């Protein structure tokens, strides 16, 4: 069986185009590890960049993108189950999988094989938390994580009160229903990190935000609202969907939306890197390569690290 290659990195680091270039070179298929790219119709705001999967005259097979409806709430448990179905199918065909994304919790959960279970809604707990601020909810979540010895629910993933309440709900359930934390098989993988210096990352984030707005991100979100998706359900997804929705429904001006969203994405990228460095402290070996190296050089470096013959 061919060992999986994992490519991780912060937003705007070019990890998807790198994964696609590598896949074209070694005849691999890509499994996405992005908590928002699972939603159909949320293309510009989540940065799917589907053109990246076109390499020359072929399209690299990709998985776990556009698999559920916007307005629904896809979760880590579902991702784990879906990942294993796809992963097992790929390796059974003798093909090498490449796991690629920036959602560190998704990546870590499948590599480590964390035991998860579907967590039911706890309406009494939700009612109790409804009036608390995001700061208060975050403090409660950190306390629960400490008591659970949990690495789940990094601040990257709880940037709205609704998401924080769901995270508290899950951690509370897990505290009351402990499980064996290794019931799923861990996945052996070579892990590649795409490192991009802070100044270049900030420049690319701002450039990409402007580009997405020019490409029609506001209209994309208007169309989702016109389809009957409640604003709070889009705000739940955070970042672009939070700030642009607030602009579309008249809560902020365009200029304020852009300013706040730009800051939020920069903060998000920083938190992603914090998560990846935390993975190293938790025992993962990540081979870092420079995002600014030429594509051919990056592909060659990965092949060398993974001991893949040219």
Description of each model-found segment:
Residues 1-310:
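Phosphate/pyrophosphate-binding catalytic cores of soluble transferases and nucleic-acid-acting enzymes
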